[in-house]
Amino acid sequence: LAVLLAVVFPGSPLHVDASPWLPLHLALGIASYGLFAAAVVHAALMSHAERQMRQGADHDGGLPLLTLERLTFRFVGAGFVLLTATLAAGWFFGEQLYGKSWVWNHKSVFSLHSWIAFAVLLFGRNRFGWRGQSAVRVLYIGAIFLLLAYVGSRFVAEVLLERIA
C-alpha cells in the first residue's frame, strides 16, 4: 500500500546527510511498522479463531487462540519499543533539521496518537488483563493512527492541502 501511494503521490527525496539520526530514524520506523503489521495480521487471525470457537466450528488447523494472542502482544510490545526509539530519534533528528525538536505537523500528531494508543493497549493488558476483541480494537486504532502518520500525512499535505491552496 505504501509503495503504491508513493508511486501515485511522489514526494521530494530526503537528504540522508541532513542528519546522522535520519537513517536510524528511518530504519527504526520501518521495523516498527513491520512489527505492528505482523501484530495486526495476527490479531485478524485471532479474531477469526475466536469467532470460529464461539460458533462451535471445527478447528481449521491454524494456531491455537492463546498462541495467536501471545504472539500478537509480543509483536505489539516489540513494535512499541521500536516506535518509542523511532520517536526519540526523530526528536533528535528534528532538532538538527528544523531547528526545534518537535514540529506539530500531521506526522507528529498521528505518531504521538499511535504511541498513546499502543501504550494504553499494553498498560490495559498488563494492569487489567485486556484480551480478545477489546484489545484488538485498540490495536486497530493504534495501527490506523500509525498508518496515517506516514501515508496519511503525505496524503493530507500533498493532496488535500494542495487542493485547498
Per-segment meaning from a language model:
Residues 16-27, 98-109, 135, 165:
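Non-cytosolic membrane-interface motifs at loop->transmembrane helix junctions
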Residues 1-10, 29-48, 69-93, 106-160:
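Hydrophobic cores of alpha-helical transmembrane segments in multi-pass integral membrane proteins
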Residues 53-58, 90-101:
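Short acidic alpha-helical/loop segments enriched in Asp/Glu that coordinate divalent cations
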Residues 49-68:
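Membrane-interface interhelical connector segments
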Residues 13:
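Gly/Ser-rich phosphate-binding catalytic loop and adjacent alpha/beta segment
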